[in-house]
Swiss-Prot record:
This is Large ribosomal subunit protein uL22c. One of its GO terms (molecular function) is rRNA binding. It comes from Cryptomeria japonica (Japanese cedar). Belongs to the universal ribosomal protein uL22 family. PROSITE patterns: RIBOSOMAL_L22.
Length: 126
């Protein structure tokens, strides 16, 4: 097996203060895209989840360049996943001295990029 075609680069952001469902709908759009396509998708989408996902994507590309010397033009998004993180539990003051619980969800965003310099099989986005 050719070593150059199997290099994978990963970046993770943990405890992002956002619902995992809201971040997932953005992350699903990135799978199978090249790095440049994913950047343009994230720059034009109007969702709040785009900014932390964009930071993770840029971090993964920087890891590829600095750690392995891979040019950003040869990267594509192999996997973009969003998992649930811990939930911050707080209380909201209400009338008559009561308190109602509120939950502030967090999520973990991880993006895996793959180098396709010697590989001819780039996944086609469906």
């Amino acid at each position: 097996m050719n070593r150059a075609s199997t290099r994978k680069i990963r970046a993770v952001a943990k405890h992002v203060r956002m619902s995992s469902n809201k971040a997932r709908r953005v992350a699903h759009q990135l799978r199978g895209c090249t790095y440049m396509e994913a950047l343009s998708i994230l720059n034009w989408m109007p969702h709040r989840a785009c900014y932390p996902i964009l930071k993770v994507l840029r971090s993964a590309a920087a890891n590829a360049y600095h750690n392995m010397g891979i040019d950003k033009g040869f990267l594509f998004v192999l996997m973009a996943e969003v998992n649930e993180g811990p939930i911050f539990k707080r209380f909201r003051p209400r009338a008559r001295g009561r308190g109602y619980p509120i939950q502030k969800p967090t999520c973990h965003i991880s993006i895996t990029l793959e180098d396709v310099t010697d590989s001819n099989s780039i996944m086609v986005k469906k």
